[in-house]
């Protein structure tokens, strides 16, 4: 059975659907939606849009035999009958259910109203200092663009590297190749591991900054896309309200209220995008293209583009969080080291500031990354023996002697003075009752645990939720088990020694 495929001539401008013929019967395939592509080409290239308008203006001027004017020359959309801009009604009786597409004059008014609110906002003072990438007009946005790192930034990175490792001697001495850097910043002998060089450390920091810039650009692009959708909705709402002579007074008021609300939402979306770092010229160009939607294909295209941008930004953000969660947290026993901190922290994350919250990943998170998270520490509410409550930066790790250590740090006088206290942890208490009066502050979500120290004292802490409670109780329990195993192996090796 022969099958003939007839395709339209690409040179011919007329649209002809593809037809498959088989056995004398033909099947007509649906036409490809070219409207969205036409709108995208119009929105990507402002110059093409201006050329198209100029050609239409010249044709209309020659048809009416009137001299062209740079001020009063009507744009083709304005010369159309306003009634023709409405969607063709399926039911002529339901006039109130029709939506209209704005003419150029209405689109310009909507554009000015949307952009005028962000002009006077004190928050939109330009792009963020850490945002980069060509987010200006021209559509040359790429997620991989990043600014070159200045020499001053590299110098600061080197200083941070030296401060992290507390010394520069291992970098130039021959004995530094057999030493590793532990999570608390001290140098501890590591079997088969060497220090990370300055070049490697700087390269990791550059890659990290590039990923952060890429994520930031994706979020800005998503915000601009959402602002474009909101602007298109505002333009359609304004056109619908303007073309309501045949409606009753009640429906006209509803249309006006909807137009005002849509313009407000669009203005706030534009302002939010500019606060996130979007370039104002690029934002104006995008909104100007969005308010000139002429068909349902244009709105569908804007919506699909915004949804895709949001999904891409969410993917990059999830990737960044996954990289944070997958920091090297391999146990020293698994690496064959004789003594090292169990909660070893990767050097590329050792200079990160304290966030106050523990990141949470999948179900295997507790068994893989708890040691590092506990070594880095987080902010917990601690109750003293007198019943007072204080916020402490709490961390638990295994020291060189193989003991589980609880470290509590607090800042005083605006961070001028810092106090640190350390205790040896012997046991985890999970049967701590709820503190009196804490039920008034989301008490149903709070959980409590205690750590028994070498002085037989139980220090109580409050967790914000069940997940944080499991991280601390199970993580410290695992640290205690590892410390006991190391102690047992040490005693066995001493007993077996001649």
Swiss-Prot record:
InterPro entries, per database record: PH_pln, VAB, VAN3-bd-like_auxin_canal
UniProt feature, compositional bias: Gly residues: 174-183
Protein name, entry field: VAN3-binding protein
One Pfam match: PH_2
Top-level taxon of origin: Eukaryota
Compositional bias segments (type: Polar residues): 59-73, 122-134
One biological process term in Gene Ontology: leaf vascular tissue pattern formation
Region Disordered, annotated ranges: 1-38, 55-95, 122-153, 172-219
Species, as recorded: Arabidopsis thaliana (Mouse-ear cress)
């Amino acid at each position: 059975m022969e099958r003939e495929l007839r395709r339209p001539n690409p040179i011919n401008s007329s649209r002809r659907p593809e037809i498959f013929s088989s056995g004398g019967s033909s099947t007509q395939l649906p036409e490809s939606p070219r409207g969205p592509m036409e709108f995208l080409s119009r929105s990507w290239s402002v110059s093409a849009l201006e050329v198209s308008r100029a050609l239409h203006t010249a044709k209309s001027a020659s048809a009416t035999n009137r001299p062209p004017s740079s001020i009063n020359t009507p744009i083709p959309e304005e010369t159309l009958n306003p009634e023709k801009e409405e969607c063709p009604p399926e039911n002529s009786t339901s006039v109130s259910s029709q939506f209209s597409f704005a003419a150029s004059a209405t689109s310009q008014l909507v554009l000015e109203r949307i952009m005028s609110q962000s002009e006077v906002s004190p928050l939109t003072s330009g792009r963020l200092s850490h945002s980069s990438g060509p987010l200006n007009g021209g559509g040359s946005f790429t997620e991989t663009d990043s600014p070159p790192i200045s020499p001053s930034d590299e110098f600061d990175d080197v200083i941070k590297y030296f401060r992290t490792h507390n010394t520069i001697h291992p970098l130039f001495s021959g004995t530094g190749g057999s030493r590793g850097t532990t999570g608390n910043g001290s140098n501890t002998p590591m079997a088969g591991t060497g220090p990370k060089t300055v070049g490697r450390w700087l390269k990791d920091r550059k890659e990290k900054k590039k990923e952060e810039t890429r994520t930031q650009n994706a979020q800005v692009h998503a915000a601009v896309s959402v602002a474009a959708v909101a602007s298109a909705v505002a333009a359609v709402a304004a056109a619908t309200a303007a073309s309501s002579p045949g409606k009753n007074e009640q429906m006209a008021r509803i249309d006006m209220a909807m137009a005002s609300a849509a313009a407000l939402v669009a203005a706030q979306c534009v302002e939010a995008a500019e606060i996130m770092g979007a370039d104002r010229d690029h934002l104006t160009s995008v909104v100007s293209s969005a308010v000139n939607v002429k068909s349902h294909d244009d709105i569908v295209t804007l919506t699909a583009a915004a949804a895709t941008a949001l999904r891409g930004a969410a993917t990059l953000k999830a990737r960044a969080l996954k990289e944070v969660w997958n920091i090297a947290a391999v146990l020293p026993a698994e690496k064959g080291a004789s003594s090292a901190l169990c909660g070893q922290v990767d050097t590329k994350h050792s200079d990160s500031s304290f966030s106050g919250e523990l990141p949470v990943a999948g179900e295997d998170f507790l068994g893989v990354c708890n040691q590092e998270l506990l070594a880095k520490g987080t902010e917990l509410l601690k109750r003293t023996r007198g019943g007072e409550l204080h916020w402490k930066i709490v961390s638990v790790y295994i020291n060189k002697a193989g003991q589980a250590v609880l470290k509590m740090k607090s800042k005083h006088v605006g961070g001028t003075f810092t106090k640190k206290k350390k205790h040896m942890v012997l046991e985890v208490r999970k049967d701590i009752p709820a503190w009196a009066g804490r039920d008034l502050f989301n008490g149903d979500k709070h959980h409590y645990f205690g750590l028994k120290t070498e002085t037989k004292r139980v220090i109580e802490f409050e967790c914000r939720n069940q997940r944080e409670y499991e991280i601390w109780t199970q993580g410290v329990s695992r640290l205690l088990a590892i410390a006991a195993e190391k102690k047992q192996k040490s005693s066995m090796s001493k007993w077996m020694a001649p």
